Amino acid sequence: TPCGTLFPYTTLFRSLGLFLSIIVHELSHSLVARNFGMPIKGITLFIFGGVAEMNDEPPSAKSEFFMAIAGPLASIIIGGIFFLVNVTGQAIMPEPAGAVIQYLALINFVLAGFNLLPAFPLDGGRVFRSILWAWKKNLKWATRISSRIGTGFGVLLIVLGGLSFFGGNIVGGIWWVLIGFFMLSASRMSYQQLLLRKALEGEQIGRAHV
């Protein structure tokens, strides 16, 4: 039967759909960044999205805001499409196909929600930094505040992952700990890179005046 044929491939289709959803999420960042003249050096992917690596800081708070919000908006749109497909086609879809569609709708909403957390360098953290930047007109200060929040969030994930691990959820606990360490490292590194760029800019300006 069609259902029996689809069941063995359900996990494969879910995994493929998740991977493609993350790719679209990150490509949305890249397209908006290119529109603002910001080249993307690379993208680091992980289970709940990714982090775009740029050669330089965004030219303005406005450009960072739109680049950061593009990914979550893309995920919300994709999730909405899968949700509508599930609602309208539930009566005629085979059960395994319906399960995959439901999963992809849910995972895209989760992807958007997680990335909108105000923890730098997640998308939400970049949105928050752009708001602070626009408010104080000080990128260094905005990055320092956002980076501290990102660091705190990383520590929180590590603690929750440890509790989950010792509570019996071994795989889930390990995932949260790994993501927490990634967040911790990325948030600190982002601020250090900004300080280095500012120092190099100051050195170049000093040499130009010699």
Residue ranges and their predicted role:
Residues L6-H209:
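Hydrophobic transmembrane alpha-helices and their immediate loop junctions
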